[in-house]
């Protein structure tokens, strides 16, 4: 069992000196005897993440009153007991322990469980003094490095604006049979205010059709307490809790966990970097506190945290989880409204990943694995859209489009290694898109080097449609590599074997009214010897 470590003086100064930036913390008195809590403490559910062959992370956060100050918790460290069992009735408990939920970390609990068997399910739960128990979650360990699992099943989801619709898609995810893991590509929360949510005009209805308020609580997010409260609001959703309890999440982040379209040290308003760094640090601390991730993801004040990481599933799949926000070169056109006036001249040193992450990715692409999955946030495919007056729009600067040399290095690196098994998982754009990524941007119908599946949003942009102006602008004449595009809501599932990769595009009939139904819009097959898409 691994829990959050005691911090050395050096690490405190370099990394956890970040605690000096925490907002509004009073001095804390350690308490091994649990204080009386003002209500049921596990209102935010449970979660698991980042499975390895011998274990995984289990998570909860104590918040008897989620939207109150400090989640309704006293400013004390509270002991939380945890158990991991081989059966859902907890007849055979194989690991257990106690962890202090500390106010410095929003009373979150991250336990890194180890010493377990590979390729099998486990169940977990938490307790506080007095016997109050959490919900029960389930999670599977990964296979051993030398194993070839017969099948691996992955869901891909993200972009869940609370005020745009219900999270019914997560209820359907919780009912998906045999999921091994879910990759969350980001935009888990949105940073805007209640006033902005109200102004957006999305009309939300309950299952009976009555209009209800589903708005953000509070102002735009800047402080640690702001971000903590917003996560508490989102995590109070029962459908999201059900998904977390049913499958391990591989958590990443995009822009709205901090601020729209931020990149590196800049936000879109060009706030002085030293001030934006405070906001970003608060946001990333809250992301850590509310995500089932390992302690290596704990944010450091010196910016030294590497959020990118790699997970292997035997010799069947290597998953490269990227961070396409933290290390970006400065965007040339930070204001999208001025894009047409910008000269698009990215230098050879521009990067969406930064030099260290880019080198790490290229060195880790493995021909020895049957499949390589690049799990990231923004589209790689060179999409071109038409303006209403007919001219081509572009580049889409917030995507890999905005870093063409970085994209060329990625695509050329795949080609040079003669890899034919690279699949790219993408989100962010609130639409479904399926593509064969071409080797050259100027040969758009030329040979492909990878396939890309852009998964739509859970709720962002509301109900959506198969056809809409937002996707109609991407024609197949301009984008011959594009095999499907729509503006529906939902998620993707991957069924992966040694001989075949199948992606199912799962879509909702509605999200603005409670009770949306799920269907499969389309299915695609990829074979590991060629980056070609075939309709199933």
Model feature map: region roles:
Residues 29-32:
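Sec/Tat signal peptide C-region and signal peptidase I cleavage site
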């Amino acid at each position: 069992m691994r829990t959050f470590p005691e911090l050395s003086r050096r690490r405190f100064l370099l990394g956890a000196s970040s605690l000096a930036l925490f907002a509004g913390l009073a001095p804390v008195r350690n308490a091994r005897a649990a204080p009386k809590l003002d209500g049921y403490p596990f209102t935010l559910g449970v979660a698991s993440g980042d499975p390895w062959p011998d274990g995984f992370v289990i998570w909860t956060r104590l918040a008897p009153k989620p939207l109150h100050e400090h989640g309704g918790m006293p400013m004390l460290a509270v002991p939380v007991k945890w158990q991991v069992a081989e059966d859902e009735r907890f007849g055979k408990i194989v690991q257990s322990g106690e962890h202090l939920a500390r106010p410095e970390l929003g009373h979150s609990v991250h336990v890194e469980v180890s010493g377990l068997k590979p390729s099998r399910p486990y169940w977990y739960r938490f307790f506080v003094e007095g016997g109050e128990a959490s919900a029960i979650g389930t999670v599977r360990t990964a296979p051993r490095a030398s194993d070839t699992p017969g099948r691996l099943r992955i869901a891909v989801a993200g972009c869940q604006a609370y005020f745009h619709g219900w999270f019914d898609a997560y209820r359907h995810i919780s009912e998906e049979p045999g999921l091994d893991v879910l990759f969350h590509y980001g935009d888990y929360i949105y940073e805007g205010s209640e006033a902005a949510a109200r102004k957006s005009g999305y009309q939300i209805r309950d299952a009976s059709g009555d209009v209800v308020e589903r708005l953000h609580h509070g102002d735009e997010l800047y402080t640690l307490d702001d971000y903590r409260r917003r996560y508490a609001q989102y995590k109070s959703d029962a459908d999201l809790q059900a998904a977390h309890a049913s499958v391990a999440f591989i958590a990443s982040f995009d822009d709205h966990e901090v601020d729209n379209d931020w990149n590196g040290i800049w936000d879109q308003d060009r706030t002085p970097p030293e001030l934006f760094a405070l906001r970003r640090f608060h946001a990333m601390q809250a992301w850590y506190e509310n995500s089932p991730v390992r302690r290596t993801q704990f944010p450091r004040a010196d910016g030294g945290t590497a959020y990118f990481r790699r997970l292997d599933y035997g010799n069947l799949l290597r998953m490269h989880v990227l961070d396409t926000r933290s290390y970006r070169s400065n965007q040339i056109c930070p204001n999208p409204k001025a894009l047409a006036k910008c000269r698009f001249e990215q230098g050879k040193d521009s990067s969406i990943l930064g030099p260290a992450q880019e080198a790490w990715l290229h060195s880790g692409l493995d021909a020895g694995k049957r499949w390589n999955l690049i799990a990231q946030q923004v589209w790689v495919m060179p999409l071109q859209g038409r303006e209403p007056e007919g001219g081509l729009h572009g580049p889409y600067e917030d995507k890999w489009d905005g870093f063409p040399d970085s994209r060329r290095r990625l695509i050329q690196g795949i080609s040079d290694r003669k890899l034919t098994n690279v699949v790219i998982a993408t989100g962010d754009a609130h639409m479904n898109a399926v593509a064969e990524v071409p080797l050259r941007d100027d040969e758009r119908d030329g040979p492909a080097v990878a396939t890309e599946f852009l998964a739509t949003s859970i709720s962002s942009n509301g109900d959506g449609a198969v056809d809409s102006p937002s996707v109609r602008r991407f024609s197949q004449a301009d984008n011959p590599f594009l095999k499907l595009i729509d503006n529906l809501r939902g998620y993707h599932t991957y069924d992966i074997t040694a001989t075949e990769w199948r992606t199912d595009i799962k879509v909702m009939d509605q999200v603005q009214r409670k009770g949306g139904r799920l269907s499969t819009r389309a299915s695609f097959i990829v074979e590991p010897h060629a980056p070609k898409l075939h309709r199933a």
